């Protein structure tokens, strides 16, 4: 699905992609909010979580576990969303169900450490967008 390009109001790429996809689906320009992953979705009427290049799955403070496997298990046991959208750099949105998104994370995610300013905990971070990633999304 092609995402509408709108005037950028956020310097954060992820917030901009979320706003653009929400506009594409609803016709509304919405303010980005920090919705807890286990309570609601980025685009609630579609039960959809929106991600983009280099995203963090969830902050270390709210995603429990000390290993990649523990964090994946915790996230997918508690996540509210049932649809996951990856907005590519060319503004194509790739939609995934929960099982496909988990495979995506297992393929392109890695355990990383938050900055000391944010507590220094472990988090899952997705790699920056690559041709291999786009090919995977097209085949999924």
Language model regions located:
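Nucleic-acid endonuclease domains
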Residues: 1-140
